[in-house]
């Protein structure tokens, strides 16, 4: 699971921090002033790092932090995350996502189940009333079966899978 989480977080990183080096600065490369006779130190181009407006030496460059991870390892990580939640008794399967659209009723249902930070995985057809009710509840995340991932499962205390999403999850793991 740790490898899969590290892979997910590395893929998520942007890595778009960048500065201009002396070759990227738009400035003349001609000598600033003559070598001798001025009383000043000798200098060449004005684009070097010690001058204002010059390029930075050894600064951050644009690069990707992502790395490869085999599909079998990713699938194994997802299996172990789901089985871990099941062993701890933190996996709940709901038969439907029927809801009247009121946040208070859904919150009361969740409190009756005794769940705190929760991830809800829905099937292909998510009821709009359920989404409306779930959007306003703190510590409740709603994911489609397509977006199921190890990091979100591990991050939340409880996992609720709606019955129509269960077959898609089983299909993905087989």
Where are these regions (language model features)?
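A generic structural signal for short, solvent-exposed coil/turn residues
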Residues: 17, 24, 50, 85-86
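A short, flexible low-complexity segment enriched in Lys/Arg and Gly/Pro that occurs
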Residues: 1-36
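Residue-level detector of alpha-helical recognition elements and their boundaries
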Residues: 16-20, 40, 47, 93, ...
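Charge-rich, low-complexity amphipathic helices
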Residues: 23-31, 47, 100, 132, ...
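Extended polybasic, low-complexity segments that bind anionic RNA or targeting/receptor surfaces
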Residues: 1-14, 60-174
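Glycine/serine-rich anion-binding loops at beta->alpha junctions
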Residues: 25-59
